[in-house]
């Protein structure tokens, strides 16, 4: 059996350790060359959690510290000749979660202390902003070189309270105060790099640093974090072959499975395909494809967000929108879309330049399945002992194309859903319908546009396409008639598959399916 060739840095985010201990490093140093050649001085990068931001920040630290030996054989080794050693202040804010104001001030104190030991502390420097200001100036005076400031996960202290106004305000004031010296420190700074998940416009980073380059949506930086398809198939090809052999798959089958699970991220209009690096590295190291990123902990703010905005998973599969709707500051959010995109639960699927229209969607199977598991308890009883029995019977019926039996299973099951989980709206029934089919990894879409309307749901099977119309307290015949009247079947006539239309009637009193009609085109 083939062995894994590379040594994978599971849980390691320090560039120095990766290079010194011989772990696989996917070279991203060409982006540092790009920054330096363009004279870029203040940079902000937004990427989802566990997506390689901290490793890139660590790489920048090693570069500006002049650690030439760590970069041997990498792209930047051909560019850099001088390797000037700058004083580097690297603040990791990822540990500042779930703090109140006192806890956050204590955390900032611990972040500043090591640099005050190095460069001293001035009299009268009490508050974090005063201390940061003094450290940068003394570092410059003592070394003769301008300082570099790296702030990793700058928004971590605020994300968990983003929708709790009374808790957010004091924490935001503390962070605003801490970041406030950066603008006036310009003469003492060589470079500033800030990472995060989202944008808090009222922090001084964005309101005062008017020369800040936000590279998060630029094509040329789409692969700055994460692993591109090219990087995967060149640097990890032997290991994909070894994994495939262990899983009784060909190389192509294994690559396709990795792609389905972890690929699909796009961070700009013309972005490369980007794989989730956390999951990919874990999978390659373990030799097993599993939901590592989603399973590593769903942030509490996401659960609050889904609840606050009553997020319907079926609408997330394809969201047509404009840039300002998802690339906006957290304080200005009136819907879940921006934070779902910035957190990695949605990504750019398509861009239409004529209308400057973006289509956002769920990036891959790992995220899709994770969201399904997260949302299903909102619509069904999570403690039902017969959930698995229902899903098994439902699954078998669907895969043998016995829609009659599948709907009978669904009718029986839905009648037992607790009353307090029901709201009787057509959207609610549509969501339950969608979730049950999606849980089986069947390709189903809701609200699918045709020339003069939207089909409630379209399900694609290997040899058959099903078009569904759902009605509440109306007849199945009415639902079937609407499919014909609105031309919902027309887009699929050229696909060469069986076309079946299904009208379904839900009874809000009985809280389940009351009738259905099935007709083949």
Spans of model-derived segments:
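Conserved catalytic cores of phosphodiester-cleaving nucleases, focusing on short active-site segments
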Residues: 433, 455-472, 486
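Short beta-strand or tight-loop elements
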Residues: 451-455, 497
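Structural motif
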Residues: 148, 464-466, 500
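Mg2+/Mn2+-dependent nuclease catalytic core
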Residues: 169-173, 472-489
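Phosphate-binding site recognition
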Residues: 1-425, 440
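Domain-level recognition of nuclease-like catalytic cores that cleave nucleotide substrates
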Residues: 491, 495-521
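A short acidic/basic microdomain associated with nuclease active sites
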Residues: 436-450
């Amino acid at each position: 059996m083939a062995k894994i060739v590379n040594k994978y840095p599971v849980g390691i985010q320090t560039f120095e350790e990766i290079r010194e201990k011989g772990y696989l490093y996917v070279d991203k140093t060409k982006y540092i060359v790009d920054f330096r050649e363009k004279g870029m001085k203040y940079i902000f990068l937004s990427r989802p959690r566990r997506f390689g931001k901290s490793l890139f920040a660590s790489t920048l630290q090693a570069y500006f510290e002049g650690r030439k030996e760590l970069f041997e054989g990498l792209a930047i080794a051909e560019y850099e000749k001088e390797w000037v050693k700058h004083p580097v202040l690297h603040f990791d804010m990822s540990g500042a979660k779930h703090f109140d104001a006192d806890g956050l001030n204590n955390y900032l104190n611990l972040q500043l202390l090591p640099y005050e030991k190095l460069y001293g502390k001035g009299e009268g420097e009490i508050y974090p902003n005063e201390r940061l200001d003094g450290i940068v100036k003394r570092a410059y005076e003592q070394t003769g070189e301008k300082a570099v400031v790296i702030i990793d996960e700058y928004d971590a202290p605020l994300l968990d309270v983003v929708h709790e106004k009374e808790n957010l305000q004091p924490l935001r004031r503390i962070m605003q105060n801490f970041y406030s010296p950066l603008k006036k420190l310009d003469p003492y700074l060589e470079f500033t790099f800030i990472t995060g998940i989202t944008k808090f416009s009222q922090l001084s980073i964005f309101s005062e640093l008017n020369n800040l380059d936000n590279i998060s949506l630029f094509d040329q930086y789409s692969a700055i974090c994460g692993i591109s398809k090219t990087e995967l198939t060149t640097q990890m090809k032997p290991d994909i072959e070894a994994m495939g052999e262990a899983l009784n798959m060909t190389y192509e089958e294994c690559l396709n499975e990795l792609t389905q699970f972890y690929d699909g991220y796009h961070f700009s209009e013309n972005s490369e395909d980007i794989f989730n690096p956390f999951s990919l590295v874990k999978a390659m190291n373990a030799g097993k494809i599993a939901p590592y990123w989603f399973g590593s902990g769903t942030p509490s703010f996401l659960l609050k967000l889904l609840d606050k905005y009553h997020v319907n998973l079926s609408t997330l599969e394809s969201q047509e929108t404009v840039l300002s709707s998802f690339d906006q500051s957290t304080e200005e959010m009136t819907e879940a879309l921006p934070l779902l995109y910035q957190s990695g639960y949605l990504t750019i699927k398509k861009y239409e330049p004529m209308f400057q229209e973006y289509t956002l969607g769920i990036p891959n199977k790992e995220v899709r399945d994770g969201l399904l598991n997260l949302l299903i308890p909102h619509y069904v009883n999570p403690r039902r002992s017969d959930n698995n029995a229902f899903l098994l019977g439902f699954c078998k019926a669907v895969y043998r194309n016995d829609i009659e039996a599948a709907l009978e299973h669904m009718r029986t099951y839905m009648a037992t859903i607790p009353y307090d989980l029901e709201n009787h709206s057509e959207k609610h029934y549509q969501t339950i319908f969608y979730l049950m089919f999606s849980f089986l990894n069947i390709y189903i879409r809701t609200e699918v546009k045709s020339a003069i309307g939207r089909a409630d749901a379209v399900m694609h099977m290997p040899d058959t396409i099903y078009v569904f119309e759902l009605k509440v307290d109306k007849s199945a015949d009415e639902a079937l008639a609407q499919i014909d009247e609105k031309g919902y079947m027309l887009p699929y006539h050229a696909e060469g598959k069986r076309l079946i239309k299904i009208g379904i009637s839900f009874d809000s009193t009985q809280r389940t399916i009351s009738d259905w009609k099935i007709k083949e085109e």
